[in-house]
């Protein structure tokens, strides 16, 4: 089976709705039986909370440290961890140059750190080729941030199911 333990409006390390992903990681992931794989797709709300470039840089570093902590804990339990890049958000209420820089920093780390067992590049799958900082026009729900039904379908259809064998 599949467990989706994402919470709308949640953050990895600070604020957001409900306990942070890092706070609930042991309970939500490590305490579950027979977990073999984990996809981490979280961080946009942390980045969206930044009010300055300095804060955005700090949040990017905190996200990377939190991902690293979750990866290490999961690996210690024999769980394969797949990192998913953060979707484009230009045109949304989160769109500022410093938040874009933080997203780019985090996505670069997800893609190139070699900490994850594999990377699911949702950024690449969902971005507009004519403006790579924006989500494809017909793939969001009107806010340039959240995928719509077609967007989620596109994301799902582009996950390599061979990762789960």
Range-by-range predicted roles:
Residues 67-75:
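Surface-exposed amphipathic alpha-helices with a cationic face
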Residues 1-2, 33-38, 76-82, 114-118:
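Loop/turn elements at helix/coil->beta-strand transitions in domains of secreted/extracellular proteins
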Residues 1-68, 90-95, 137, 146:
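Conserved SGNH/GDSL esterase-like catalytic core that processes O-acyl groups on lipids
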Residues 2-4, 64, 78, 105, ...:
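Extracytoplasmic/cell-surface-exposed regions of Actinobacterial cell-envelope-associated
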Residues 27, 72, 108:
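Surface-exposed charge patches
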Residues 22, 48, 86-165:
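Catalytic His-Asp segment of secreted/periplasmic serine-dependent ester chemistry enzymes
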Residues 41, 84-85:
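Conserved beta-strand segments of the P-loop GTPase G domain that flank and frequently precede/overlap
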């Amino acid at each position: 089976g599949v467990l989706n333990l994402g919470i709308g409006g949640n953050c990895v390390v600070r604020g957001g709705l409900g306990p942070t992903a890092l706070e609930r990681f042991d309970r939500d992931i490590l305490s579950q039986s027979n977990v073999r794989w984990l996809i981490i797709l979280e961080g946009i709300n942390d980045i969206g909370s930044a009010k300055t470039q300095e804060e955005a840089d700090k949040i990017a570093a905190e996200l990377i440290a939190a991902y690293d902590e979750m990866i290490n804990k999961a690996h210690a339990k024999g769980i394969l961890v797949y990192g998913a890049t953060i979707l484009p958000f230009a045109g949304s209420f989160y769109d500022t140059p410093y938040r874009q820089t933080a997203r780019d920093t985090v996505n670069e780390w997800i893609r190139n750190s070699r900490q994850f067992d594999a990377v699911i590049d949702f950024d690449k799958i969902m971005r507009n080729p004519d403006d790579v900082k924006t989500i494809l026009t017909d793939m969001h729900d009107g806010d340039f941030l959240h995928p719509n039904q077609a967007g989620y379908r596109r994301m799902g259809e582009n996950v390599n199911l061979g990762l789960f064998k």
